[in-house]
C-alpha cells in the first residue's frame, strides 16, 4: 500500500498545475470553456497522448494518471472536453481505422470528437437525433452510440448532420444533433475497452469534482477570514467554523472514494467508480452550496468563482444520471 | 500508487484469519453480535482477552518496547479489519487503549512493572474518571480535588458517565491538585484503587435499560503519591494524549462495515427509501475506511498524522447512528422490542420476535446516541477540525 505519486506522476501533476495556474485565478476560473489555443497547447505538451491507450497510438496512462490530470483541471475549474473527447471517444476509436484518421489530431488537440448517444441504423444509414451532445458544436466527428447499443463514427462534415446550439449551465456549449441518413462507420472497440472508457470518463468527472471542491473550500476559508461583520472576521464565529469543518469532511470523504476508485484492481473498478459517483456528486454540490452561503450575496453573483463553480459542479455532478442513477445501480 | 497488500501482508492476513477461525467460539461470536453497548460484557470480554493474551496479540497496538508485537500501522489495521469481519468482541478500551499507552509513555518504571502486566491479565479492570457533573466538554473546569498529605493525596469529588465502573477495580482520574493556577495547569493524573475506603459507585441506567454508566463518588480517598502518573500539574497534557488515542487510536470503519453487512443479511432485501439509506451508509463507511487507511499508510511511510485524522470520530459517530437507525426502521415493530433482561445473548432473554438482531436493535439505537457525545462531542470535534485542518 502506497499513496505517494511516482516521479513521473508528480511531474505530470506539476506541469498541468503550472499550465492552469498561469491562466486561471479566482477572477477567471469557470468564466467560459477553455480556449482552443489552450487546449491545443495541452495537446502539444503530450497530455492527451498520455491518457490515450497504446492501441490508439497513445502512451497508455491509466486510472491514476486520469485522476491526477482531472483533479488539476477541476481545481482550476477549467471547462474542457477531457472526459468525453479524450477518455471516452479516444478509446472508442481504438482498434478501428478511425484511430488512424482521428487519433493524432485528437491527441494533439487539433480536432474534437464528441459523444452522441442516439439514432438508429435504417438501411445502413444513421437516422434520428441525440438530444444533448456536449461540445457537439465544435466536434469534428461524433462517436455515436445507437439506440441498439452499436458504436459508430460519424464525420461532422456529413451533409446529413444538423446541429442546433444548446448552452449548458456551466457556460459550455452543447448541440442538439440530428442525423438525417448519414454515413456511419462501425467502430470495432477491443474487448473490455468500452467499459474501461466509461469507467475512466466517470473517474475523470469525479476527480474534477474533488478538485473543484478543494478550490471552493480554499476560497471560502480565505473569504471568511477576511470578511468582517459585527466588528470581527466571520471566521471567528463557531457556526461558520463548523460549517467549514463539515465542508472539509465532505472533501476528505470524497477524495477517499476517488482514490479507492482510481487504485481499484481492474475487476473492482466499475463498482468503485460507481460508488465514487454515487457519493461525490452530491457531496460536491452540497459543498458548493455551502460555499455560496458563506460568501453571502457575492456568492450568488457571476462575479466570483464561487457562483460559477456552483454551476460547473451542478453540471458535472448530474452527468450520466448523477448520484441517483449511481446509487440505484449499487442498490440493485 | 497502489492499494495492494504485499505478499507478507497477505500472509499475515491469512495467519490472523486462521487464528480467528480457530479461536472465536460460537458463544463469543453470538455474545459480540448481541452486545447492545459499546463494549462487550465482562463474561465475553474476559474470555476473549485471555485468548488474545495467550496468543500475544492482546496489546497489538502497543509498541514493542511496551510489550506489543511490533506491528506496523497497516498490520494493526489488517488485524482490526479481520477481527471486525469475523465478529470478534469489542474489548473495553479503558485499560488497553487509554491508560495502557499513558502508563508506558508517562509512567515510572515501577508503575509500568506493576500495572502493565496486571492490565493484560485483567487482574486490573480499569474505569475512566474524567467527566464530572459540571465538567463535560469543558473538562478543564473539573473540581475533584486532591490535597497533598505526606505521601498521600486526599481525593474528594464526583465523577460521572464512568463506563463499566461497576466491573472495574481501578480508576484513572483527573484531579485538581492546584486551584490557584490556570485551570489546565492545576490538574494531575492519578491511579486509584477502587477498593480504597471512600470510593462509592452508583449505577446510571441508560435509556436503553442497559447498565453501562455510573457515577463514582470519592470521599477523602487516600491515594499514594506514587500512584500519580507524570508530574503534579501535568495531568492536562496526559489527558490530551489519551483523548487523541481515544479518538484516533484505531480504525472505526471496519466494525461499522462488518455490522452493516451482518445487518443487511438479517434485514433481507430492502426497497425504496430504506435501500437508498443503506447504500448511502455503505458509501459513507467505505469512504471512512479509506480516509482512515490514507492516514495509516502515510504513517507507515514515515509521515506525521494528517489533520484529516480528526474527522474520523465525528464521521464514525454519525455513520454508526445511521446504521442503528436503519436497523430499527428495517425491522419495523420487531425493531422496537426492548426487554428488560440483560444481556441479550443470555438465557433469561425472552424469545425474540423476528430475529435476535431485531430484538437488540432498539437498545443499540438508543445506546448509539452516545457516540456523538463521548470522547469529545461532535461539536467539539468540528471545532478541532476547523482549527487544525483549516486554521480557523
Residue spans of the language-model regions?
Chain A
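Flexible, small-/acidic-enriched active-site or ligand-binding loops
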Residues: 130-135, 156-186
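Alpha-helical interface subdomain recognition
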Residues: 1-76, 199-332
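The feature captures the short pre-catalytic strand/loop hairpin that immediately precedes
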Residues: 190-195
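Short, glycine- and charge-enriched coil/turn segments that flank and shape catalytic ligand pockets
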Residues: 96-101, 125, 185-189, 266-270
